[in-house]
Design a protein with these regions (language model features):
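Structured, contiguous alpha/beta core segments that scaffold functional sites
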Residues: 1-266
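Short acidic DE-rich linear segments
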Residues: 2-3, 364-366
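A contiguous, surface-oriented mixed alpha/beta subdomain in the mid-to-C-terminal portion of proteins
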Residues: 189-345, 356-360, 366
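His/Asp/Glu-rich mid-to-C-terminal helical/loop segments that flank catalytic regions of hydrolases
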Residues: 349-350
Length: 366
């Protein structure tokens, strides 16, 4: 039996809809873009992805709480530099930065962008003697990933200019160039730059940020109007007189209704003043549901329970027993992995096995 033209059009429309959805996921604004020759690989489609990630981390309350607590849990109750690496115990550079400070800085970059960078300075014997955490947003890799390009002012959109340094692990020590940069980018297999731990919830982070802006605008502008005040026979009123009338209405309205009205200036003679209430819609409820869903997705992407950042769970509140259970699971499956990553990096740079220990995080509600 032949399909009708209407059926064919419906099928075609559905297929096109599916294709449109698929196309949204073919193009990735976070995708690396390779330059010509041995040029800089753009971090994101326009080389400005780090700025977006940093802005999100600073403006999303939920994401910031997750990042801050992730750093705390990964840092444990402190850093111990073992005897074999005693030269790093007091400080790691001439500025007096401690090993704890260094690790805190690179973890902040890691949880924000998924990457971090450390400048390593050598003595004439090729031994590392100073470590400086770099702002990873100001670093880029070349196509072969063996050079780190650093721009102390940061990269502009499509910008590629910067100082080139040998990347740690990709070049032998050169006495003429006593500086290398250790650039961590995960396994670096699928993409040049690692993905932020929360990247799967990027849309949700932006939703929360825009939701906060919407709330601010609503408060600043008195929320939506709840009443229409129709004033008849106003054809001869001047704008100044209308302003006086509006101010008079505000003076007589009180509480939350003081600014929640619209005035309709009618021309009908003999008609009495009329006040009508605008029927409320479900926008606030839907808005709240969207914000709550966004928060939940951010926690999911960070693989954290809201309890771990001190947020009460809906319908259950805050329970110390549930918190301890959530922490034990998070520590065993997530935090220890981050700690192993950090210890491996420090071992690699210092050339000392088990150079540091991270004191287990202790929790007491006494």
């Amino acid at each position: 039996m032949a399909k009708s033209k209407k059926s064919e059009k419906t099928t075609e429309k559905v297929l096109m809809s599916v294709v449109d959805v698929e196309q949204k996921y073919v193009y990735d604004p976070a995708e690396d873009v390779y330059g010509g020759g041995d040029g800089v690989v753009s971090w994101g489609a326009d080389n400005s992805l780090p700025k977006l990630l940093i802005n999100c981390a600073e403006k999303s309350a939920t994401l910031k709480a997750c990042i801050d607590q992730s750093i705390n849990y990964a840092m444990g109750d402190g850093i111990i530099v073992n005897e074999e690496a005693a030269s790093w115990a007091e400080k790691v550079n001439r500025r007096g930065l401690s090993m704890k400070d260094l690790i805190n800085r690179i973890l902040a970059d890691f949880f924000t962008t998924g990457n971090f960078a450390i400048q390593v300075i050598f003595n004439k014997l090729g031994q590392p003697v100073e470590l400086f955490p770099l702002d990873v947003a100001k670093c880029r890799l070349n196509k072969d990933r063996d050079k780190v390009i650093y721009n102390k002012r940061g990269f502009s959109r499509w910008g590629t200019a910067g100082e080139r340094y040998d990347r740690w692990g990709y070049a032998d020590f050169d006495p003429e160039r006593p500086t290398m940069i250790y650039f961590y980018n995960g396994d670096g297999v699928r993409k040049v730059y690692n993905t932020a731990p929360w990247a799967a919830a990027l849309d949700d982070v932006l939703t929360e940020i825009e939701g906060s802006r919407y709330s601010l605008n609503s408060v600043a502008n008195g929320f939506s109007a709840r009443y229409i005040i129709e004033i008849p026979d106003t054809a001869n009123l001047t704008d100044e007189q209308k302003d006086v009338v509006v101010e008079g209405i505000k003076d007589h309205f009180t509480g939350t209704d003081a600014n929640n009205f619209m005035v309709y200036w009618g021309n009908d003679e003999g008609k009495s003043l009329e006040v009508r209430k605008i029927e409320a819609d479900e926008t606030p409820e839907r808005f709240q549901a969207v914000r709550q869903a966004a928060k939940e997705n951010i926690f999911t992407a960070m693989r954290m329970s809201p309890l771990l950042v001190g947020t009460a769970v809906a319908n259950t509140g805050f329970s110390t027993d549930e918190y301890m259970s959530a922490y034990k699971l998070y520590n065993r499956t997530i935090a220890l992995g981050y700690q192993d990553m950090i210890k491996s990096v420090i071992d690699d740079i210092t050339g000392v096995e088990n150079a540091i220990e991270i004191v287990p995080f202790s929790i007491s509600f006494d």
